[in-house]
Structures are given as structure tokens and as C-alpha cells.
Amino acid sequence: MSWRSESIWIEFITGSRKTSNFCWAFILFLGSLGFLLVGTSSYLGRNVISLFPSQQIIFFPQGIVMSFYGIAGLFISCYLWCTILWNVGSGYDLFDRKEGIVRIFRWGFPGKTRRIFLRFFMKDIQSIRIEVKEGVSARRVLYMEIRGQGAIPLIRTDENFTTREIEQKAAELAYFLRVPIEVF
């Protein structure tokens, strides 16, 4: 989602609050909870859940392994829910032609670098760079090349843009910033 005027362009970044992340966190939580309950029921020798009779799963080694997978899955699920709660990766890119300043803001993990804020002059922007790698794991990334700071990614790799959409966005941004486009 973006907002544009004659001299200002604001590009909003979604971050980790995506439908796919909610689905994965929920599925992982339920699956790992199931593994932990089956491991616990095999340890106790009673049916904690009535899907499997406890006599079919022996505690050593199946119950221990299922309990371990359940605990590990709960930790990973907790991590996913925390990234969703903190909305890690969300923010905005603000390009202001009137002031000649570019501001990039992202939310990070709690701590000293919770707020990631980059600010530089438009005259330091060398080019807009498109990096496209096709194949099994296709990767399309849009970078902004900054003099003295290297390349700063503007579009995340997990956003499923087609090559045409990336090219369109790069062309519009390069036209707005009045810089060339490089393709790799």
C-alpha cells in the first residue's frame, strides 16, 4: 500500500502480521500441543486425549521423542506469535522531494534496536537496483543503492511480486527519484 503526491511518496510495509504467519503459528501451536499431549499420556499411562490408546505408544523412545517435538514446536510457535504481536518488519519508506530526504523506518525486536530509522539525502541515491533470480526458489528484490552505505532492500523477498510488478515499481520509484535503474 502506498500514498503519493507531487513531492512525497510513502510506501507502507506490512511486516509480520500476514495471514500466512497467523496460519502457520496457529497450525504449529495445535500440532505441537498434540505431540506434547501424546507424549504426556504415554508417560502417565492414561489417555489424556482419547484419539490414541496410551498402550500403543511406549514412553521410551516414542513418548520422549514426541514430547521433545511438542516442546520444540511450542517454542517455535511462541516465537512466531511474538513476532506477530510486535509486528516485526513493518514500517514505511518516505521519499520527500521537497526536502530532498529519504526516511526508512522499520519495527524490530524489543531492545536497543526496536526502532530502526534510516535517513539520508536524495542526492546520495545512486540508483534503484532490481535483483532477479529465477528457478526453484525464485527471488525478486528491489534495492536502493546509496553512496557510501551500499544497497538497502526496499521490498522483502517473501512478498510474492511478479517480475513485471517489481519492474513497474522500480520504474515508478526511479522516475520519482530521478535516478537510473540497474538490473542484476
UniProtKB/Swiss-Prot annotation:
Cellular localization per UniProt: Plastid, Chloroplast thylakoid membrane
Disulfide bonds: none
GO cellular component terms, A-Z: chloroplast thylakoid membrane; photosystem I
Membrane topology annotation: Multi-pass membrane protein
GO annotation (BP), single: photosynthesis
Membrane-spanning ranges: 22-42, 57-77
Keywords: Chloroplast, Membrane, Photosynthesis, Plastid, Thylakoid, Transmembrane, Transmembrane helix
Family note: Belongs to the Ycf4 family.
Function, in words: Seems to be required for the assembly of the photosystem I complex.
Stated name of the protein: Photosystem I assembly protein Ycf4
